[in-house]
Amino acid sequence: MLNEAIKEVLSGKDLSESQSEQVMENIMNGQESSALIAGFLIALKMKGESIPEITGCAKAMRNMAVPVKLKSQYAIDTCGTGGDGGRTFNISTAAAIIAASAGVKVAKHGNRAVSSQSGSADVLKELGININLEKSKVEHCIDNVGMGFLFAPSYHSAMKNVAGIRRDLGVRTIFNILGPLTNPAFVKGQVMGVYDRKLLEPAAKTLLNLGCERAMVVHGGDGLDEITTTTVTYVCEVKDGEIRKYTLSPGDFGIKTTFYKNIAGGTARENAAIIMDILKGKTGPERDIVVLNSAAAIYIGKKAEDLKEGILRANELIDSGKAYAKYEEILNYNN
């Protein structure tokens, strides 16, 4: 089947959603050779992944994931595609903790570093969080504490069939896009960063196809898969079954534009130290970018009416010590 799919894609045709779902199912089940999988991934990348292709592949991966069952009716994720080459510290991970302190239920889906020095799993481990917590405890932690970490390899075991191929190819493929779209808790809210502005609308439409209620799909004008503070950010917002496009600027919220070097990260240990400083109230550009991304998570988590209120809440939670207290609560539950 993959042979035929490659021929179609090479001729410039888009695969249907059902074709894409079947192809991804075969890949995940180990039914296709490494050479064919690599050929398919590169052919798809060269053509450009269509919305039906992304949706079908995401559905296959979601169907094969170990499901996380929450009592909470509404939970969110703060997860980007990565692959932006930005090498910032783990902004969305810090934002997840602050959003949880606002009362948002956060099912943080993530992995170890692929192209950066520190993935969400790496930095959470440095922060003392058990990234291999058993599923029932993660479910309880999200429902009762407010945030739990879903370590991707534990919930998408079939990914082992493509891990080596992705590593050998060394280029971004559809799997970069699929990571944030395949949260095993099937969250209804999402702040999703993408590495390419062209992916904003396809990602937003795919989220709608997958039943997402609220989302902000974001891409920084500097290339970051976050809401940035160095320049404008492009946004596709999903709300009430519709997609709205707009741009954000740090100045819109009274935040000073900064230089990239001021939000750069390092090793997992260095990034954990930056996050700890922010949670303890340190001010500066690193806090500014975390507050802006936390505001988005609080807004998508339905705990603020808009981003401006989200920023006020994020700052209050940090300054009052509630954000750090939430981190300690998560830490204590995980150990």
Swiss-Prot record:
UniProt cofactor(s): Mg(2+)
Cofactor mode of binding and number, as noted: Binds 2 magnesium ions per monomer.
Pathway annotation: Amino-acid biosynthesis; L-tryptophan biosynthesis; L-tryptophan from chorismate: step 2/5
Binding-site positions, anthranilate 1: G80, N111
A matching Pfam family: Glycos_trans_3N
Catalytic activity annotation: N-(5-phospho-beta-D-ribosyl)anthranilate + diphosphate = 5-phospho-alpha-D-ribose 1-diphosphate + anthranilate
InterPro entries, alphabetized: Anthranilate_Pribosyl_Tfrase, Glycosyl_Trfase_fam3, Glycosyl_Trfase_fam3_N_dom, Glycosyl_Trfase_fam3_N_dom_sf, Nuc_phospho_transferase
Ligand binding (anthranilate 2): R166
Any one biological process term the GO annotation gives: L-tryptophan biosynthetic process
Keywords of this entry: Amino-acid biosynthesis, Aromatic amino acid biosynthesis, Glycosyltransferase, Magnesium, Metal-binding, Transferase, Tryptophan biosynthesis
Source species, domain of life: Bacteria
GO terms, molecular function: anthranilate phosphoribosyltransferase activity; magnesium ion binding
One GO CC term, this protein: cytosol
Binding site for 5-phospho-alpha-D-ribose 1-diphosphate: 80, 83-84, 88, 90-93, 108-116, 120
EC number: 2.4.2.18
Coiled-coil blocks: none
Chain residues that bind Mg(2+) 2: D225, E226
Positions that bind Mg(2+) 1: S92, E226
Similarity-based family: Belongs to the anthranilate phosphoribosyltransferase family.
Subunit-structure text: Homodimer.
Role description: Catalyzes the transfer of the phosphoribosyl group of 5-phosphorylribose-1-pyrophosphate (PRPP) to anthranilate to yield N-(5'-phosphoribosyl)-anthranilate (PRA).
The name this protein goes by in its record: Anthranilate phosphoribosyltransferase
Protein species of origin: Clostridium kluyveri (strain ATCC 8527 / DSM 555 / NBRC 12016 / NCIMB 10680 / K1)
Gene (UniProt): trpD
